[in-house]
Amino acid sequence: MSLGTEEYTWFNILLESMGAKKGAEFMQALAKQDLQMPGSSSVMRVQLMLAGESAIAIAARGRRVTEYKQQGAPIDFRILDPYAGEPNFVALLQRAPHPHSALLFIDWILSEEGQTRLADAAGRIPVRKGIKQKPWVQELFQKDFVFLSPSSIGPNLNSLIEQYNQIFAVRKTK
């Protein structure tokens, strides 16, 4: 089994859904399962799995797995509970050098055209309802996502990273 070295969103959602104590116990038991932690890239872990380096890629990005599956790779996935969705954010800096241009971009990226472009060109899962998605992405909608609340991770990010690194023996280089 492989797990990324920076799966903090997945880690936080499981701790929240299972409760801190039970979640930590689960993670400690998982860490004892001879995990491979080749790096932070989900794509790389899925590619290593396809090359036979591991049988399971935990917390792999579903859109990448479905993309490889659609291309004929011998791969499949299971959606477990909770099904963690990792939103992409768009923000405007308080002192942006060109705030009006930034607002126009935000309006566009959230528009039907912008969300369609994200779905088509980047293979992203749009947040806007009614956007036609690539057929192979439809499998990811078998269950509802549980999204990470930025307010739950933001203030606790450093301690969450420390706990993750300690449980999974992740060594960070400075």
Question: Model regions: which residues?
Answer:
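Short amphipathic alpha-helical coupling segments at ligand-binding clamshell hinges
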Residues: 22-26, 97-109, 117-120
